[in-house]
A protein has these predicted regions:
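Juxtamembrane/disordered regions of integral membrane proteins
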Residues: 1-137
Length: 137
């Protein structure tokens, strides 16, 4: 249980920091180009707790799937899980693109950032929640 909690906390901290840096700093101008598609900043900040809840849910889900015995464990398994989960997210973004007026550039950049986020999350979780070694080996 200790590894689970530590992996969750580490993944959550990374996801929050990466989201702030990638979306809030690196993609700030790209998001500004599509500002009409988003809530005003003041309103968004009033709902910021929902972002944190969503990021906690993402970290928790990642660790739960990994801890359920995902492909033997270790960093490589964490990376594979991260790639699979981001493929799922990109698939959902394709539907968003078809049904909502999001610029393709924004969705592509969000997806690139998503792959980085999920791969690094996989490395973090895989390193912390690595398989237990047999005694005496």
């Amino acid at each position: 249980m200790k590894r689970f909690i530590i992996a969750f906390i580490a993944a959550f901290i990374f996801i929050v920091l990466w989201g702030w840096f990638y979306n809030g700093v690196l993609l700030k101008d790209v998001f500004a180009e599509a500002q009409s598609l988003f809530r005003p900043r003041e309103e968004m900040m009033g709902l910021f707790h929902w972002i944190i809840i969503g990021q906690a849910g993402l970290a928790l889900s990642f660790v739960m799937i990994y801890a359920s015995g995902f492909a033997g464990g270790g960093i490589a398994s964490g990376v594979r899980l991260g790639i699979m989960l981001e493929i799922l997210a990109v698939s959902a973004r394709c539907a968003f693109y078809a049904t909502q007026p999001f610029p393709a550039k924004l969705l592509i950049l969000i997806s690139i950032g998503g792959f980085i986020e999920m791969i690094v999350t996989g490395v973090i979780v895989g390193a912390i929640y690595k398989p237990a070694t047999a005694q005496g080996s």
